[in-house]
Structures are given as C-alpha cells and as structure tokens.
Amino acid sequence: MDLSLLKALSEADAIASSEQEVRQILLEEADRLQKEVRFDGLGSVLIRLNESTGPKVMICAHMDEVGFMVRSISREGAIDVLPVGNVRMAARQLQSVRITTREECKIPGLLDGDRQGNDVSAMRVDIGARSCDEVMQAGIRPGDRVTFDTTFQVLPHQRVMGKAFDDRLGCYLLVTLLRELHDAELPAEVWLVASSSEEVGLRGGQTATRAVSPDVAIVLDTACWAKNFDYGAANHRQIGNGPMLVLSDKSLIAPPKLTAWIETVAAEIGVPLQADMFSNGGTDGGAVHLTGTGVPTVVMGPATRHGHCAASIADCRDILQMQQLLSALIQRLTRETVVQLTDFR
C-alpha cells in the first residue's frame, strides 16, 4: 500500500470549491500516465482510464473535506469562522487548525467556540493576534479556508490515522485504480471522477455525471458508527471487517440486481463485505443516480472511526480489499452484464 500517497491526500487542505491541493495530486498521476482529463464547471476532475466501445462506467469519489471558512475579523483579532459541511460539534472546540490564505500561506491557530448544551456556536480561530491589523498583516482575509491541522500517522496492526479520510480514501482508490489498470484491456469505458463540493450538497457528483453520462456508477465514500467500540450485530461499519456495501441511505436505495452482482463477485475473489444502511445522511450517489434518465448506482467504501472531525482511523486491509474488489468489478462489467443489470422486464 502506498502510504506516502495516502499521507499526501490526507494532509492536503480542500474544503468545498477550494480543492486544488487534492486536484493537483490527481492531475500529476493522470499526466504521468498520459490520460485524458476533463473538468466540469465546478472543478471536478474527470479522468478517462481507457477507450472502449463497451458500456460507460463511472467510479466517483469526492475531493472536499469538512472544515471552515473565515467570515470576519474582530477589532480584537478574533477570526470568526463558519462551518463548511457538517463538522461534528465535539470537533468545534479547542482544535488545532490551519488557515490557507489567498497566497497559499499556511497560518496555524486554535479553533474555539461557545458551547450551549450540545451546540457549539460563535466559532473563532485564535492565531495569537491582538488586533484586526495583526490578522490582516498575516495575510488572512474573509473567505480564506480553514482545515484541521492533523498529521497523518501509521498505527499498529495495519491501521492509519489522519484527517479528511472522508473522502481521501476514495481519492486514494481512484489513483490506485489508475495505476493498476492504465494499460489494461477492459470491457467498459471507465471514467475515474473526483467530484467537487460533496460535503455541502452533493454538487459535483451531479455535474460530473452529466458530463460523463455513465451507464453504471460506483460511488466511493466512508462512514463510521456512532459508538466506535460497539461490535454488535447492527454495526456494519467496523474497521477491519471488509468494505461497506451501502444498500440504502437517505438519498439512494441501491438497485438489488447491482448489489447482488457485487456480492457475487466479492464472494468469488474472497473479499468480505459489510452490508450497511445509512439512517441519516447521503453521498454523491444521491445526485448521481438521478442524473439524466437515471443511472444504476451503488455506494461502497472502507469503514472508518471518528468521521467529520480532526482525525479518523481506518484499516489498510479494508482499503486494499476495496481496491481488489473495484478492479474485479471493472474487469467484469461487460455489455451483457450491464444489460442484465438494467433489464426491468
């Protein structure tokens, strides 16, 4: 497993609409392998893996992470911020963050906020300034992006910890598929899509799908269980138990034919799956499957612990198994298979 790649993706700072640091990593890989690259109007990256007269398949992961944006600067030097995406309440107080300025300078600071019961409001970043002028002299302006200042780390037992695993694990899988299959003979035309602005309303998933117009889509994302050490029967997001296959969420109910086919392929190659359902929230799959006249879509990905906060934990074996399964699925998506998956008679 390429931990240096995962580290680079995790430590890149990219809230919605400001995803250049992640985009650049993907573009360097595509350019190195001389792949065709397109963009939608929001900045999503569309990489054409191969040419084929077969069906068109889209593998999608989003580039953006939850974070904050500078709203205003007080006379005393407090930097007021607003959340971008659903940052956990517990992660809105006393967290190390960094502000990326318009000149791409990184300014460290401490995030804090006012707690009222379970709610945290009036969030601000303290960079040690004593006045608005000192903040401005540091190059900070309203609109600058703020992300958690988290270093990627390798943990015991093949596990890793870092920020933005939602959804840099998916972006990592896009790159590994690009490397593995860049010169393979495939039955389908495959597009690897890194979408923009998922955390603020599934935006890039919709525009990118319009650009690709796929016959089938696989959306890569992550999720965690509310109680990290609950290993009960209801928890299908346990790290180390294999990738998640999301049967339903608030925005998408996966087609049974598609999920059954994936389960069959996973069994053939010995990859365990966790059949999961989201009681709250959704993914790009909600936008993807409603594009055009409708796209058969499924959501998959490695489970994590501690989502939408300063750091998450994942199991490298889950990531590798997800890569293995994606490769097998892509190599089996023939025209006949797609016809069977989309036959409603």
What residues fall within each predicted segment?
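N-terminal hydrophobic/helix-forming segments and targeting peptides
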Residues: 1-345
